[in-house]
Amino acid sequence: MPRSRINGNFIDKTSSIVANILLQIIPTTSGEKRAFTYYRDGMLAQSEGNYAEALQNYYEATRLEIDPYDRSYILYNIGLIHTSNGEHTKALEYYFRALERNPFLPQAFNNMAVICHYRGEQAILQGDSEIAEAWFDQAAEYWKQAIALTPGNYIEAQNWLKITKRFEFE
């Protein structure tokens, strides 16, 4: 069983207390409760920069969690850690898996776009403009999906799409 920790921050303490109360009163299976505990501990470890511990908790949470919607957020957070670690291929895999379970995660589309844009920039530095354009086109598609889900967000992406003539906004 993962260790439960309460941070010294008042808001974190309050959130932990509320989460513990909800775990006790909401009618869920013991497996779902354990999955949530691992997820919560994973988020705490991730927020502290302890990515190895966070991944262990998230992997255990995915093993226990049966709800596709809840699993999508666990998988998304695993993707975030792989992105932070520079493991972009793994990150993309987890973002895809999250979107398979919950296609309404604009942040996953955005992060996938950022990775593709970065890879496009790397291709330019290596002198391969054809590969760069393919990556930029893929980034544009992901940003369009993120923007479609949350039209008021991702202003920088919208500006990039306009400047590069990859998308016209009304």
UniProtKB/Swiss-Prot annotation:
The gene is ycf3. Belongs to the Ycf3 family. It is a peripheral membrane protein. This is Photosystem I assembly protein Ycf3. TPR repeats lie at residues 35-68, 72-105, 120-153. GO terms for biological process: photosynthesis. Essential for the assembly of the photosystem I (PSI) complex. May act as a chaperone-like factor to guide the assembly of the PSI subunits. Keywords: Chloroplast, Membrane, Photosynthesis, Plastid, Repeat, Thylakoid, TPR repeat. It is found in: Plastid, Chloroplast thylakoid membrane. The keyword Oxidoreductase does not apply. It comes from Saccharum officinarum. SUPFAM superfamilies: TPR-like. Its main location: plastid. SMART domains: TPR.
